């Protein structure tokens, strides 16, 4: 078995950027900052530019090519002008860039092979004075830059490489993982990468860290790291319980059997239709997929709606006796036919233990001894002339009826209006009306577009 320090030394050698890589990034960042200042000079208001993020703090993993520049405008500038001037600067610096939207629009593009975000914000005095969420980012950068020495910075790189390798890195709402800022705060708080994983293996959520001891509220999240620049904010709010558990699992594995494997992301190969059918034959369950056009939304808006919709469909299936073994939302954005412009189709995919139910279902009333409620139940069915209803009769101590089941097959339910009555995301609901329903072997036809998430579904691991 490899010694842990030997493993980390090898990972550090390839994950920490070489001087030439750092110098190249710094040169490009300086060029971009100069271009930004030139664009600012053409505005009728004052502003400055600051580089933020991991590439500003030498805490990025080798190969990352992200440069984040924030243009800080006077706090008195209204939101409309901030957006107007911010976009003007962004398009001047990145003429081939495009607009994206966080709390307000910004420009994203490429320059000399680097991915660049040029974000306008307000130049507020403290993070507590923020006008929009992005205003706090320069304070994050200043806090960490003042505290991370070279050794801790290298340990941050190890932590990020580890989290990327296990699939738990990224605060986007698709991943729900560890943000870069959260990762750096944890390394700083625990004193290094090894102390972090040694601590994490024994965590019993909820776990809370408050670096500045200034929390002004309580939080309900499984991991709480109070923002040292904002006592009302949990930096780990986006982190899912699943990704926290995943981190703990691999922390234990790394310490028990040191290996470079957790630091090496593996892109799963897509399943083909034959692979899917092989899994179906072996599992003898009934898969179903509700497939529809993905709403034209950025991932941070799309994925919460897909998860909400999946939860609604799963509840609907379970409530009608089609017992769901496992389910997940999928998009074709990572499939081999994806064109890089985001998801075009989405699927709510579930594996069922039961796909067909009897024509009747049992409905229990209250115990006969509960006079008022029992009488109401009895009378409501005693006068029912529906020939498909059996009873009411007494079974044990209560009234029971057996009545016609609304849906006997899962296809009937998923193709009915009732399937759309569950809690769906607002934009998903519109597309859901034009859904396709696949049952059984028919789901294998999804493989060309959904092969990667299908492999993740049928070959799960921590």
From Swiss-Prot:
Entry binding sites for CTP: 54, 57, 140, 160, 169
Binding site for Mg(2+): 66, 68, 117
EC number: 2.7.7.72
A Pfam family matched in the record: NTP_transf_2
Reported cofactor(s): Mg(2+)
Top-tier EC class: transferase
Catalyzed reactions: a tRNA precursor + 2 CTP + ATP = a tRNA with a 3' CCA end + 3 diphosphate; a tRNA with a 3' CCA end + 2 CTP + ATP = a tRNA with a 3' CCACCA end + 3 diphosphate
One GO BP annotation of this record: RNA repair
UniProt-listed InterPro entries: CAA_C (IPR048833), CCA-adding_arc (IPR008229), CCA_tRNA_nucleotrans_2 (IPR042090), NT_2-5OAS_ClassI-CCAase (IPR006116), NT_sf (IPR043519), NuclTrfase_I-like_C (IPR011068), Polymerase_NTP_transf_dom (IPR002934), tRNA_NucTransf2 (IPR015329)
Lineage top rank: taxon: Archaea
Keywords: ATP-binding, Magnesium, Metal-binding, Nucleotide-binding, Nucleotidyltransferase, RNA repair, RNA-binding, Transferase, tRNA processing
GO molecular function: ATP binding; CCA tRNA nucleotidyltransferase activity; magnesium ion binding; tRNA binding
Binding site for ATP: 54, 57, 140, 160, 169
Function: Catalyzes the addition and repair of the essential 3'-terminal CCA sequence in tRNAs without using a nucleic acid template. Adds these three nucleotides in the order of C, C, and A to the tRNA nucleotide-73, using CTP and ATP as substrates and producing inorganic pyrophosphate. tRNA 3'-terminal CCA addition is required both for tRNA processing and repair. Also involved in tRNA surveillance by mediating tandem CCA addition to generate a CCACCA at the 3' terminus of unstable tRNAs. While stable tRNAs receive only 3'-terminal CCA, unstable tRNAs are marked with CCACCA and rapidly degraded.
Family (UniProt): Belongs to the tRNA nucleotidyltransferase/poly(A) polymerase family. Archaeal CCA-adding enzyme subfamily.
HAMAP family in the cross-refs: CCA_arch
Self-association state and partner proteins as the record states: Homodimer.
Extra remark beyond the main annotation: A single active site specifically recognizes both ATP and CTP and is responsible for their addition.
Official protein name in the record: CCA-adding enzyme
Species of origin: Halorubrum lacusprofundi (strain ATCC 49239 / DSM 5036 / JCM 8891 / ACAM 34)
Gene encoding the protein: cca
């Amino acid at each position: 078995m490899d010694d842990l320090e030997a493993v980390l030394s090898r990972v550090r050698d390839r994950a920490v950027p070489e001087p030439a890589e750092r110098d190249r990034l710094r040169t490009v960042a300086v060029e971009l900052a100069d271009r930004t200042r030139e664009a600012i000079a053409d505005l009728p208001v004052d502003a400055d530019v600051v580089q933020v993020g991991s590439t500003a703090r030498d805490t990025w993993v080798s190969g990352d090519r992200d440069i984040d520049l924030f243009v800080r405008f006077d706090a008195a500038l209204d939101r409309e002008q901030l957006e107007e001037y911010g976009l003007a600067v962004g398009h001047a610096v990145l003429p081939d860039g495009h607009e994206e939207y966080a709390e307000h629009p910004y420009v994203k593009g490429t320059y000399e092979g680097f991915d660049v975000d040029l974000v306008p914000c307000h130049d507020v005095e403290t993070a507590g004075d923020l006008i929009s969420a992005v205003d706090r980012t320069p304070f994050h950068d200043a806090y960490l830059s003042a505290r991370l020495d070279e050794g801790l910075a290298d340990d941050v790189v190890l932590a990020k490489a580890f989290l990327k390798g296990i699939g738990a890195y990224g605060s986007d709402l698709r991943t729900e993982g560890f943000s870069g800022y959260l990762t750096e705060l944890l390394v700083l708080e625990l004193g290094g990468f090894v102390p972090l994983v040694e601590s994490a293996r024994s965590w019993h959520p909820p776990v809370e860290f408050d670096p500045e001891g200034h929390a002004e509220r309580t939080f309900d999240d499984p991991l709480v790291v109070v923002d040292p620049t904002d006592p009302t904010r949990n930096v780990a709010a986006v982190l899912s319980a699943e990704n926290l558990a995943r981190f703990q699992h691999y922390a234990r594995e790394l310490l028990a059997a040191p290996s470079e494997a957790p630091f090496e992301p593996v892109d799963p190969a897509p399943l083909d239709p034959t692979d899917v059918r092989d899994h179906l034959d072996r599992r003898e369950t009934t898969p179903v997929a509700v497939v529809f056009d993905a709403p034209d939304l950025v991932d941070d808006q799309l994925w919460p709606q897909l998860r909400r919709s999946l939860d609604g469909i799963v509840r609907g299936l379970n409530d009608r006796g089609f017992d769901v073994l496992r389910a997940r939302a999928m998009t074709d954005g990572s499939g081999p036919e994806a064109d890089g412009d985001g998801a075009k189709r989405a699927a709510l995919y579930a594996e069922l233990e039961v796909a067909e139910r009897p024509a009747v279902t049992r409905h229990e009333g209250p115990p006969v001894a509960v006079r008022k409620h029992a009488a109401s139940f009895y009378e409501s069915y005693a006068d029912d002339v529906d020939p498909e209803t059996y009873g009411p009769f007494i079974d044990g101590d209560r009234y029971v009826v057996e009545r016609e089941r609304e849906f006997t097959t899962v296809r009937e339910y998923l193709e009915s209006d009732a399937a759309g009555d569950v809690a769906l995301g607002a934009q998903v609901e519109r597309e859901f009306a034009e859904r396709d329903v696949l049952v059984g072997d028919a789901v294998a036809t999804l493989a060309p577009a959904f092969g990667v998430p299908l492999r993740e579904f049928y070959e799960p691991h921590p």
